[in-house]
């Protein structure tokens, strides 16, 4: 029989990785759109966003010695805020531009967890509460005809913990490093519509500190994981009451590539698989409210394409100020 604390302990690294992907987001979630980046010089602009989602997810985790499937699950919310400052905005004679900046992000996730414990299948047994503070840097190049390459580096500090409904748990701390490269190329049509294929690749390294509760040691093995995205964004450039606006709809295929990590309890390892695929749909709008202020946001729904009932829904809202 598996103790009710075990599912929470073994999915904490996976939730840490998910928080990192959410903090990185996509270029359009952070910046709105290419047409909003129209300032130059030193400290040309600042931006910020709020994001959040409610999600349900299940992983495959096996106790290696016995080939027992714990099947840990989580149901809860992930939220965050992010603020960035462009340090340099360089507009070139050929119409292209480069933008370099720094950002801070705070991300949290909390909810209930369960699994195959106490002789029962998918039994809800406890709760998890995690928080991450992140700092990062970005460089974005936008070509004269609107294509872009966006790259990010980010370092995060994690703290929080998980506990069972019987009041036994352990605190969690650690760190992660993440890098992301994203690109998109717009195809423009005479009626003002734009179709933009996109691709993104994210790498993370997660390193959580070892811990213990009153019964066992909890040893976290550090691990690296890749996440990829292929997307298509449809947008229209128009005006509403003389305000330039850009409604959009997008579809993304997200994939966590084959990777696993170990959490050991008194030297008994539990191996969790991270590979999974999901389909995400987004709708939203960007608007340049004035010469100096722009707003943007969207709604999102995603569903897993593998076995299980993974799904999420959420949103993103942002503000950009040109100094």
Model regions and ranges:
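Outer-membrane beta-barrel biogenesis signature
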Residues: 2-44
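Membrane translocator/pore-forming domains, dominated by Gram-negative outer-membrane beta-barrels
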Residues: 5, 10-11, 40-323
